[in-house]
């Protein structure tokens, strides 16, 4: 088997230290911690009150509101970081051979925020129509959808 050469040409990052690679790197070299009080949900009933949350993230920097509503937060991070990496590599995707560009992405669980919102919403609905899920529930939640969104761009 012949091994193929892989080249990393650009980097992007969305982290608790910053929403860009330079912000993240600056935090790392200055010994900054990304930990802080949990703000994404009510954690008052949990022993742990601190987490490393991404703060100040705006998905509208890379997509419109309608498109963003179809994605879970983890996918929005992935799409934004990929856009940063493409920009960092100074790639013009219109001029590149897309058959020579790949996306490698890993996620342990996928859209847990979407899952949580849908399950809680399902339990609360008590009308004549009955409970229903958002039509984007499964597409927003599956763990490989972030790579799909990146690839479609």
Please place each PLM-identified region on the residue numbering.
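Conserved "HGTGT" condensation-loop signature of ketosynthase/thiolase-family condensing enzymes
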Residues: 1-153
């Amino acid at each position: 088997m012949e091994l193929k050469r892989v080249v990393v040409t650009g980097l992007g990052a969305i982290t608790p230290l910053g929403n860009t690679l330079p912000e993240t790197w600056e935090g790392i070299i200055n010994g900054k911690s990304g930990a802080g009080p949990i703000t994404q949900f009510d954690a008052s009933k949990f022993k742990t009150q601190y987490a490393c949350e991404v703060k100040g993230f705006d998905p509208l920097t890379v997509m419109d509101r309608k498109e963003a509503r179809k994605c879970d937060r983890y996918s929005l991070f992935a799409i934004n970081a990929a856009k940063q990496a493409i920009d960092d590599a100074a790639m013009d995707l219109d001029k590149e051979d897309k058959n020579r560009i790949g996306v490698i992405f890993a996620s342990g669980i996928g859209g847990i925020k979407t899952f949580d919102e849908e399950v809680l919403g399902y339990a609360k609905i008590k009308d004549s129509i009955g409970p229903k899920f958002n039509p984007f529930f499964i597409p927003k939640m599956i763990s490989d959808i972030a790579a799909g969104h990146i690839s479609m761009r």
